[in-house]
Regions:
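Glycine- and aromatic-enriched mobile tails/lids
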Residues: 6-172
Length: 172
């Protein structure tokens, strides 16, 4: 069940060759730093719908710029420059999924504090958010290529039948 689909290896080889041979002008470190700065500003523990929406817009811009990324090292062995370019693409994917999932969770809980939704909502959100990248992130809005699903929280009990870890609100 965990093997590559037929021909998928060739797809990834072409993607790597495309990155390695791209004649773009965007620097990997500049894009990575811009992503880091925007995530720190708008998607850290304290956030709002507006701050998350802004970060999603920046991620889209960075994705567009990523298509023009330049890899200095053209070698095929031990190419850390190419590795950093690949990792940047994955960082953009993960950042978008995290921000989109946070934007769709309209409550505050744990390390997710929404200033526009300051209280917990156990009735709706006592569950784990599961997010799946399902399409091409370059050609659509997050709702078109990120599928959100939920998995119930499993509560464990001790020998006396009490919850081992009862739900409680975090105070900041």
């Amino acid at each position: 069940d965990f093997c590559l689909s037929r021909g998928l290896g060739d797809v990834y080889k072409r993607q790597l060759e495309g990155l390695r041979n791209n004649q773009g002008t965007e620097r990997i470190a500049v894009l990575r730093k811009a992503l880091q700065d925007e995530m720190d500003k708008g998607a850290q523990v304290f956030r709002t719908h507006e701050s998350l929406e802004h970060v999603l817009g920046v991620i889209k811009e960075l994705r567009d710029r990523y298509m023009n990324v330049h890899v200095d090292d053209k070698g095929k062995r031990f190419n850390t420059d190419l590795l950093e370019a690949v990792e940047l693409g994955f960082l953009l994917d993960i950042a978008e999924v995290v921000v989109y999932a946070a934007q769709n969770r309209e409550e505050s809980r744990g390390g997710h504090m929404r200033d526009d939704f300051p209280t917990r909502n156990d009735e709706k959100y006592m569950q784990h958010t599961m997010a799946y990248l399902t399409g091409d992130p370059h050609s659509s809005t997050p709702s078109d290529h990120i599928k959100l699903d939920w998995k119930p929280v499993v509560f464990t009990k001790n020998e006396q039948g009490e919850l081992n870890y009862p739900p409680m609100e975090r105070k900041y």
